[in-house]
Curated annotation (Swiss-Prot):
Catalytic activity: 3-methyl-2-oxobutanoate + acetyl-CoA + H2O = (2S)-2-isopropylmalate + CoA + H(+)
Claim: Lipid metabolism is one of the keywords in the record: no
PANTHER family registered for this protein in UniProt: 2-ISOPROPYLMALATE SYNTHASE 1, CHLOROPLASTIC-RELATED, HOMOCITRATE SYNTHASE-RELATED
Disulfide partners: none
A single cellular component GO annotation: cytoplasm
Residue segments, region Regulatory domain: 391-505
EC main group: transferase
Identification of the protein by name: 2-isopropylmalate synthase
Residues noted as binding Mn(2+) in the record, renumbered to the chain: D14, H202, H204, N238
Source species: Desulforamulus reducens (strain ATCC BAA-1160 / DSM 100696 / MI-1) (Desulfotomaculum reducens)
Length: 505
């Protein structure tokens, strides 16, 4: 059996279904380009028929991202499939991913169809998709709760109809590793034609078993794993692809399998997805968490200092985590700055480099010791890929225990400097009310989070906000970075407002 496992990334489709996550087209393109650098085999760019915005994003990914298969999701009906093809047809390699539920509970309550009707719909959908492309994936939604004999029968029929990938999702995260492995073995054994196709798995994390189930499945013969970066997704999320990949990489002695993933790009991909979705990575998360390679216990520290492999089964460099050392200072030049950014995986054009270097010089005057983490946060904050309708020019705060907090600030809009002041319930609230007065946009703050990038009194503060506007149902995510927490808070809110305005235009 082939020992190559294909990695199917659904961060832009299933991952974006996480509550409170809403990515614009440019953000989806950023993630897609990084996924291509990471080396995933397939990017599921979205569900084109759901909205014009989703269609445009899938189409943009298909047009602009090369070296990877781009998939569009479609229900098992002709209209969905036609729209999916229109969105992905300019891809270097295009895949239509069509699905229908197969469990009795879904047939009875959701589809209101009998088993024969579902088989007919699945076969017709695959045949229709094959008119457009030779790469067609069929998914049996809620497969893990479906009758095995019926599942094998529908798989046999869609293989005859032309499906090249068969996906067996654990849609509600119900199964367990041993059970799922046997399920996969039974499907491979009982279904004629399986030797012609790639068997795929798509696991959800409702019981915290998505990665374990995915690894059990590839051990049983599956050769494609679907999941999302950082494990994001609706409800409890999807299998975290970085964990699946490093599980196979670290335990190749056990699995004997390989992927095409460029593992040093894992950490940067995780950071990018976290930054753009506004979903922080928990510190103790496997592979990419802040504490994944930290050792607190004296016994552990002593062991690692003597020999890393005493307590580290992976080393940080394998996933792209660099040592947090002093790298640059205020006397560092543009060439050294560019070289260090490229070592960290950032390849900026001239305009982006000029912006980032100007920001670096300002930071270097405020902060004596600049680390890799500082540089990463600064560059990710500076390079936003949307036009700034408003730019924060200055900020003044009056606050104290016996003073009503007041913010005065100026926002540059083209050639005009707009200035206002407002009081609030705390300095951050005062800032946001002032921004609302200037922009004329009334927003609800859904979430506010702050994180210190590094230690010390001059640490960079990284603020993420989520806002919802009365005129739009979407949530907009903004990010701001500064050694001054209030300035970072203001920049994050203005960034979110700029995204909202860009979306409305």
């Amino acid at each position: 059996m082939n020992n190559r496992v294909h990695i199917f990334d659904t961060t832009l489709r299933d991952g974006e279904q996480s509550p409170g996550v809403s990515l614009n087209l440019n953000e989806k393109l950023q993630i897609a380009r990084q996924l291509a650098r990471l080396g995933v085999d397939i990017i599921e760019a979205g569900f084109p028929i759901t909205s014009p915005g989703d269609f445009a994003a899938v189409q943009a990914v298909a047009r602009e991202v090369r070296g990877v298969t781009v998939a569009g999701l479609a229900r098992a009906n002709f209209k969905d499939i036609d729209v999916a093809w229109d969105a992905i047809k300019e891809a270097e390699q295009a895949r239509i991913h069509t699905f229908i539920a197969t469990s009795d509970i879904h047939l009875k309550y959701k589809l209101r169809k009998d088993r024969e009707q579902v088989i007919e719909a699945a076969v017709a959908a695959v045949k229709h998709a094959r008119k457009y492309t030779s790469d067609v994936e069929f998914s049996a939604e809620d497969a893990s709760r479906s009758d095995i004999d019926y599942l094998c029968r529908i798989f046999q029929e869609v293989i005859k109809a032309g499906a090249t990938v068969i996906n067996v999702p654990d849609t509600v995260g119900y199964t367990t590793p041993g059970e799922y492995a046997q399920f996969i073995r039974d499907i491979l054994e009982k279904t004629p034609g399986m030797e012609k196709i790639v068997l795929s798995v798509h696991c959800h994390d409702d019981l915290g078993l998505a990665v374990a189930n995915s690894l059990a499945a590839v051990g049983a013969g599956a050769r494609q794993v679907e999941g999302a970066i950082n494990g994001i997704g609706e409800r409890a999320g999807n299998a975290a692809l970085e964990e699946v990949v490093m599980g196979l990489y670290t335990r190749k002695d056990y699995y004997g399998l390989m992927t095409g993933i460029n593992t040093p790009e894992i950490y940067r991909t995780s950071r990018l997805v976290s930054s753009l979705t506004g979903m922080p990575v928990q510190p103790n998360k496997s592979v990419v968490g802040k504490n994944a390679f930290a050792h607190e216990s004296g016994i552990h520290q002593d062991g690692v200092l003597k020999e890393r492999t005493t307590y580290e089964i992976m080393n940080p460099e394998q996933v792209g985590i660099t040592a947090n050392n002093l790298v640059l200072g205020k006397h560092s030049g543009r060439h050294a700055f560019r070289d260090r950014l490229e070592e960290l995986g950032y390849h900026l054009n001239e305009e982006e480099l000029n912006l980032a270097f100007s920001r670096f010089k300002v930071l270097a005057d405020k902060k004596k010791e600049i680390t890799d983490h500082d540089l990463q946060a600064m560059v990710e904050d500076e390079i936003k890929h949307i036009p700034d309708t408003y730019v924060l020019k200055y900020l003044h705060i009056s606050t104290g225990t016996a003073v009503v907090p007041t913010a005065t600030l100026g926002l540059q809009m083209g050639d005009e400097l707009k200035e206002e002041a407002a009081c609030g319930d705390g300095p951050v609230d005062a800032i946001y009310k002032t921004v609302d007065k200037i922009t004329g946009i009334s927003c609800t703050l859904v979430n506010y989070a702050i994180n210190a990038i590094t230690g010390g009194k001059d640490a960079l503060g990284d603020v993420t906000v989520k806002i919802r506007c009365e005129e739009k149902e979407k949530v907009y995510i903004g990010r701001g970075v500064s050694t001054d927490i209030l300035e970072a808070s203001a920049k994050a809110y203005v960034n979110a407002i700029n995204k909202l305005i860009h979306d409305m235009q």
